[in-house]
């Protein structure tokens, strides 16, 4: 099997720890652009996105913020319009603010708000007169860092009890929370990972080595995101996910090294044997996980492309760190690892494995029974598309959105952009029809306030500039329905049909804004989930088939993997919990990666024991005992790391993802141990006929491992955990 060179190990550590690129990577990570606007990942071909781009380019409104100003002081006195105008002017002076629309743009605000025309009053004043509303638009899109800074400046000058709403304000709140909480997530995940490894591993030193190696991999992965930028979701969970994915490979190698150390003359020989013996599980697991993440790149919502590339890159860097850097660290610090060994606090799985093997038909039958229910429950899980709901209740945007609904009878704003060459009389008919659509609370349009008989030449330029630019006209429609709900989607569809009726083929018309964008988000992700699931299944099937040179094994493992994913999502259905819209796609890829790691580890070890001459029952008993230890360590580590983040996280979308990841790690481990173990055993004859080079399958006593005489004489010097011994007999069953 060859040996490692001790000097090469030391050189590897030196290179890993002191490369000039380290500083560049850290600096790149700090300056990586983070996108907080999920809607910006929608395909550019959609009409809602085209309308949003026009709104941004011509009207500076693609990233509108609604400012709610309290007009009644604590003593019940009214705040003068001049005070509100002063605030408006101060907001206008903030960098990147292109326009601020308030009642004074329409008419003289010296007129008391309660005697203004209803059309104006309903748009700019709450029904009880307690709040007034102004619309702030910017010169850049909502995902821009500069806009987030501008929103932060607006917050600083807002009077007490004043709030913000809108996509740009929500992005600002999201940034503040992720910036403050992400370091906490990482610290908690790392701390819990170290504690879990110290409990389940043989040495108190090994967890720190693993975290150090994985830390290097995470640093390089996150630093190389500088060239493409990342979404805040990717930024929040990528490090934790890479920890979970890479730790599987690390644990597989460490446990295999400990096993080979007992039968090798030197530690270098043991490491070479461990790498050779782990090749199938490491290569198969990493390739399937890699293709699972790459499947996300086929999403129309390019958020999938962002997460997919970052995580696929993380898998590659993680595997390289495990096969290059980790062996070097383990060999150099071998004496320290051995000095601080202890008995791991892990259960003895011997009886558990015997129980599963003895009742293999019952466990296999149970697996078949739960396939359909888990699929149905998973298919009916409710998804939450409203990003406002992902923020805490006390966030500025959340409070502002609630006030909009309570005080102004509106929750969502739609923008309609039409060709300005359409006759005014025709536009008025369209506006009246839209105003009568169910759920529309108010509408702001040029002809509704100026009138069709007044020429543009006598209308003030500042009024025209707000609603007319470059041959286009924009209208604002306020809705009582919350974006992403069925009622709001139906409302948007009705408005789109009305606009199409009046614009026809001769003119253009777009409906955009939160409601339209969320509607397209829902329709887009429905297709995305089906496509990515199919692609990932096909890709993983092909990889498993190539790795094992088998037709039957991919079917067995893919079904087990999918059932684990269905159970995870189905639990949310049972408890009536809505999951983030991105969860089915992301969770399926990540849990697929974890489950396939465990499945390939067990299957490859089963094949290896058969090749050594063991009977099928003896081979599975040996394979399961060795594999379950690694599966247990990995599942516990990933569970506690993600569950810890779930407990402290304030952002609902990240919190929900971590909850499902934590739950999924346990489900994946249980599915592999409880169901794949007996199914592989029962199907071994079929597998042997459909797999090239599978090996023997008849039951026979397990041979003793071949131990070199030199190692036998000195084996007592090593402080390894005592292996569980089994006595295998041919029970005569056709297993």
Role assignments for model-derived ranges:
Residues 1-36, 40, 142-383, 503-735:
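Membrane-embedded transmembrane helical bundles of large multi-pass transporters/channels
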Residues 43-65, 70-171, 382-553, 559-578, ...:
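Structured non-transmembrane domains adjacent to transmembrane bundles in polytopic membrane proteins
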